[in-house]
Every structure is written in structure tokens, then in C-alpha cells.
Amino acid sequence: MGETVRFGISMDDQLLESFDRLIEQKGYANRSEAIRDLIRAAQVELDWEEGEKEGVGTVTLVYNHHVRDLSDKLTEHQHAHHDQIISALHVHLDAHNCLEVLVVRGKARDVRRIADELIGVKGVKHGKLVMTTTGEGLH
């Protein structure tokens, strides 16, 4: 980690009040830590948009396991991407519905494509990709 540098920020007083409320709600120790976190989040988002950097994400799926061949199709997708899908958690929500959380690692564009394929399988009730970073390059 590099040397800490102090700098000033000018902003509208209402925006600052809103920011201070956010800091309190999120439990940040101070404005500096909140700003650092915002910058890191923007960096991660940019990396995902560019698509070339290594990233990691979770794909969350909710589906009815009684739908014909759905479980098999999802399993086939997972096996087709066994190098990128590094972990899977399967939860029985009730007698019919399942929750599956997959951890996917790879180039951001590949992770997004895999997530889209899984979420797009007919019979998936809800799916969501949550993208994050491997932590490499963040300070």
C-alpha cells in the first residue's frame, strides 16, 4: 500500500448531509473510508465493464426442481464450465423450490456470459449475478 495523501473535496451542503447519513447507515468510521470504498467499487465496476480482467461473482438461481429436465440442464451447464464454476451450494427452500448459489471465476466477460446462460435456462424463476473482485490490484 502506498503513502496516504490528503486532499480536499468541494460539494453541495445537501449532498454532504446525504453522504454523512449514508456513512452513518453503513457504519463507516469516517468520510475517508467511505470515499475509499466508493472508489474501489467504481474500479471493480469498470473492470467488469471492460471484461478482460479476472473477476469473481456469484450466480444465484431459484427454480422449481419438478420442472422437467431443468435440474439436468443446469447441471450440464455447470459441468460445461467446470473450470470457471469453482463452487456450488444447493438449498431446498421447500418441497418444490431450490436455491442454487454458484461461485464463478474468470474473465469478467466470460463470467457474465456463463451467468446469462444459466439465468436464461427455461424454468429458472429468478437469477442474479453479483460481481466482485479477486482483490488483486485494489488498495
From Swiss-Prot:
GO terms for biological process: response to nickel cation. Its cofactor is Ni(2+). It comes from the Bacteria. The keyword Transcription regulation applies. SUPFAM superfamilies: ACT-like, Ribbon-helix-helix. It holds the Pfam family RHH_1. Ni(2+) binds at H79, H90, H92, C98. The keyword Transport does not apply. Transcriptional regulator. Belongs to the transcriptional regulatory CopG/NikR family. This is Putative nickel-responsive regulator. It comes from Citrifermentans bemidjiense (strain ATCC BAA-1014 / DSM 16622 / JCM 12645 / Bem) (Geobacter bemidjiensis).
